[in-house]
Amino acid sequence: MSDNASGPGAVERPALANEPGDYWGSDAVALMLRELDLPYVALNPGASYRGLHDSLVNLLGNRDPQMLLCLHEEHAVAIAHGYAKVTGRPMGAIVHSNVGLMHATMAMFNAWCDRTPVFVLGATGPVDAAKRRPWIDWIHTAQDQGALVRNYTKWDDQPASVPAAAESLLRAYRMMTTPPCGPVYVCLDAALQESKIGRASCRERV
């Protein structure tokens, strides 16, 4: 970390670690979040989106969007809801796998009832069972995670490739911000996040 995190409103800025040509699926997702001009993502860290978390830190330097650490997924979504109400601009919330999404459901329902745009990103363990670690990935993987919140989101998706993820994020943003507004949910496969792609390929995805 760079030593510039003192004083009110200061933000820790990590020393960027990516080598030229060393890019991942989660990097394309992080860059797309920047292109969508989401200023913040509120999150409670979880291993299902470790790839995206890494990209937000090591590729983007924890800015545009900046991470806001929360202690509970319901808090993360509620913060995004409140930010949109005050500023008129959406922000993101990231929730961990099936358990984090279940924690977030009440706040997502509130945003739905309030017709407020909230961009909720989630993740699941590797959909390909051959890539799952024993036990832990199995209990954090679902075939249709979006079913938990489908009745009170405008749109949900679980893209199966990096190009599809970029398309999904753009579509989710448009759906979320088209009146009547409301929350959307995009679930990212852990293996998709950790798939290696080239630098040019990463830029082409966004």
Residue positions per predicted region:
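N-terminal alpha/beta PP-like core and its mobile active-site loop of ThDP/TPP-dependent enzymes
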Residues: S2-R205
